[in-house]
A protein has these predicted regions:
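Intrinsically disordered, low-complexity terminal tails/loops enriched in metal-binding residues
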Residues: 1-167
Length: 167
């Protein structure tokens, strides 16, 4: 816990050390993510600009926004896990169909049994485990807890911008 507090204070000191009269936040999360990726690409002399696709990253970030803020997630506990019906309309339903199955693969790679079923306006996600402690965790995490699992997101965004990966 102390390390976390120190990390936060260090980050605040770093921001203050840059300049107390200049803003440091970009004003919008997707904008800031794209800005950070572009800065990384510009700093890398090996960036192949003929493959860079910032538009694909932007579309993915819009999908993330749709799934996070607009998707409806109806969660039902099962004896061995959870079943979640994730639905939306229009762009939200499309984003759900792109993102949820991809994340089910990530969950399976983490040792849970995750499956999806396509629905007309979304996806049904079922995540189960034979381990009672994991079942408790699955029920606590719920839909968004599953979506944020793993540390692949930032690397995935950089790969997407480089034209190396898409959902």
């Amino acid at each position: 816990m102390m390390g976390h507090d120190m990390h936060g204070k260090h980050g605040m000191m770093g921001a203050q050390a840059q300049s107390s009269s200049e803003p440091t936040l970009p004003g919008q999360d997707a904008f800031g993510t794209i800005q950070e990726i572009v800065q990384i690409l510009e700093a890398d002399p090996n960036t192949d600009w003929s493959k860079v696709n910032i538009a694909a990253l932007r579309e993915h970030l819009i999908d993330m926004n749709e799934v996070t803020l607009r998707a409806a997630a109806d969660e039902k506990a099962r004896d061995n896990g959870v079943e979640i019906t994730v639905t939306g309309q229009g762009r939200t339903a499309e984003a759900i169909k792109r993102m949820v199955p991809a994340h089910a693969h990530e969950l399976s790679a983490m040792g849970w049994n995750a499956t999806t079923e396509d629905l007309p306006n979304g996806v049904k996600l079922v995540v189960i485990s034979d381990d009672p402690a994991q079942v408790t965790k699955l029920k606590a995490l719920g839909f968004m807890g599953f979506m944020v699992q793993g540390s692949h997101h930032q690397r995935h965004h950089l790969m997407m911008a480089k034209g190396e990966f898409t959902h």
